[in-house]
UniProtKB/Swiss-Prot annotation:
Region (RNA binding): 245-251, 269-273
Signal peptide: none
Protein EC: 2.4.2.29
Organism name: Salmonella arizonae (strain ATCC BAA-731 / CDC346-86 / RSK2980)
Primary gene name: tgt
Subunit structure: Homodimer. Within each dimer, one monomer is responsible for RNA recognition and catalysis, while the other monomer binds to the replacement base PreQ1.
Alphabetical GO biological process terms: queuosine biosynthetic process; tRNA wobble guanine modification; tRNA-guanine transglycosylation
Stated role: Catalyzes the base-exchange of a guanine (G) residue with the queuine precursor 7-aminomethyl-7-deazaguanine (PreQ1) at position 34 (anticodon wobble position) in tRNAs with GU(N) anticodons (tRNA-Asp, -Asn, -His and -Tyr). Catalysis occurs through a double-displacement mechanism. The nucleophile active site attacks the C1' of nucleotide 34 to detach the guanine base from the RNA, forming a covalent enzyme-RNA intermediate. The proton acceptor active site deprotonates the incoming PreQ1, allowing a nucleophilic attack on the C1' of the ribose to form the product.
Enzyme class, UniProt record, top EC level: transferase
Keywords of this entry: Glycosyltransferase, Metal-binding, Queuosine biosynthesis, Transferase, tRNA processing, Zinc
Keyword field contains Ribosomal protein: no
Positions contributing to Zn(2+) binding: C302, C304, C307, H333
Protein name: Queuine tRNA-ribosyltransferase
Cofactor note: Binds 1 zinc ion per subunit.
Pfam families: TGT (PF01702)
Amino acid sequence: MKFELDTTDGRARRGRLVFERGVVETPAFMPVGTYGTVKGMTPEEVEATGAQIILGNTFHLWLRPGQEIMKLHGDLHDFMQWKGPILTDSGGFQVFSLGDIRKITEQGVHFRNPINGDPIFLDPEKSMEIQYDLGSDIVMIFDECTPYPADWDYAKCSMEMSLRWAKRSRDRFDGLGNKNALFGIIQGSVYEDLRDISVKGLVEIGFDGYAVGGLAVGEPKADMHRILEHVCPQIPADKPRYLMGVGKPEDLVEGVRRGIDMFDCVMPTRNARNGHLFVTDGVVKIRNAKHKSDTSPLDAECDCYTCRNYSRAYLHHLDRCNEILGARLNTIHNLRYYQRLMAGLRKAIEEGKLESFVTEFYQRQGRPVPPLNVD
C-alpha cells in the first residue's frame, strides 16, 4: 500500500491509498461487512454506491466459517467476491465487548465462544495469522479497546499492554512474510498524556498507517474532538489516519476537519434496516405515518437507485410490511449518502472551500457548526 497526499485545507487532507487491488480516494468511508457481506448487498451493489474499500470482521470470520473454509476459496476476496481492497479489524473490539465471558491476560484473551460456549484463546500472534489467511489488504494490530469511562490508572495499564501487543503483532506480521499493510492503533482513552505515549511508542515500532481507537465508545463528543485535535498532528504526515468505528455523518465531517483520512461504521447499514435514513436535510424515519402517501423521492438531491426509482410512500409500505426489499433499498440509499458526503468533502478540500462546505452541511440540518480548536 502507498499513501499519496495531494493537498490540504486547514488540517483536512485530500489523498489516496494505492493498492494492487485498486485505488481508494481519501477521505474515505468503508462500509462494514462483518460476516463477509455488507448486509443485504451484493458486492456489485456496494461498489455502485461508490465504496472502494470495505471492512471485514476478523473475530466473526474466525468463528464462522473459520480459517480452513476461507483457505479453500483462497482468501476473503475470493470467498465473498469483492474485487477491491479489504481492511480487517483485529478482533480486539469484539472480544472486549464480550464483557464477563472473557478474561484479559498479558498473553492474550481467554473467552467463551458466543456461538457454542467453547473456550477460546486469542492473542496478537493468532490475530495476525487469521488476517493473513483472510488476505487482508490492511491488517489491524491486536489491542485492548479501553472502555469508557476508565480512570487514568486503568487507561494507562491498558494502553501500555496494547503497546506491547502492538510489538508482538508487528513481529508476527513480519514473520509471516505478509506484504500487505499493517496499522497501529492509538489508545489512551480521553487522557492526552496517555495518547502521547501511545503515539510515540507506535511510531517507534513503525506502521503503514495509524488508527485512533477507543473513541465513540460513550465519551462526550467534545472529548472525541479534543483527542483528535491533540493526536492527529503527532501522526506522521505521510501515513494515513483512521478513526475506528465512526460514525454519524457529522462525526465524519468533524473527523475530516481534524485530519482523519479513513472511517468505518455499521450506522448506515444498521440504521437503514430500522428505517432511519440519512438525507441532505437531516434524517427521515420512513416508518412514520406521515410518509404513507408521500409520492416524492427520499432525497431529491440523491442519485442512488432507490431515490431514482421509488417514492417515500413505497419505502414506507415496504418497511411497515417488513419486506426484505425495503431493507435493501434503504441500505443502498444510506451507503450512497455516505459516499456522496465523502465525495463532497474531498471536492471541498481540493478547492480550498472546506469550511464553506461544513457551514452549508450544518445549515441544511438546522444545527450550529461545532467549534474547531486547532492552530
